């Protein structure tokens, strides 16, 4: 059976931690920044964990857990 291909667009947006959690970066931080406070912009810099309902779908896109 051939190897499964990693979807490169997903590999750029998500990464898998050592414990297996899938992390994503938050949106809304690069457009219309003038209207947002510094505190809100700092919160957008933090990584978030992917929701459980989306986890299985993302695992199919990055089968080898690309970091």
UniProtKB/Swiss-Prot annotation:
InterPro entries: Ribosomal_bL35 (IPR001706), Ribosomal_bL35-like (IPR021137), Ribosomal_bL35_sf (IPR037229). GO terms for biological process: translation. SUPFAM superfamilies: L35p-like. GO terms for molecular function: structural constituent of ribosome. Pfam families: Ribosomal_L35p. One of its GO terms (cellular component) is cytosolic large ribosomal subunit. Keywords: Ribonucleoprotein, Ribosomal protein. The keyword Cytoplasm does not apply. Belongs to the bacterial ribosomal protein bL35 family. HAMAP family: Ribosomal_bL35. This is Large ribosomal subunit protein bL35. The gene is rpmI.
């Amino acid at each position: 059976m051939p190897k499964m291909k990693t979807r490169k667009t997903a590999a750029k947006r998500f990464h898998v931690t050592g414990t297996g959690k899938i992390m994503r970066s938050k949106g809304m931080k690069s457009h219309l920044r003038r209207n947002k406070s510094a505190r809100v912009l700092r919160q957008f810099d933090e990584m978030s964990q992917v929701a459980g309902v989306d986890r299985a779908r993302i695992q199919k896109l990055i089968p080898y857990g690309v970091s």
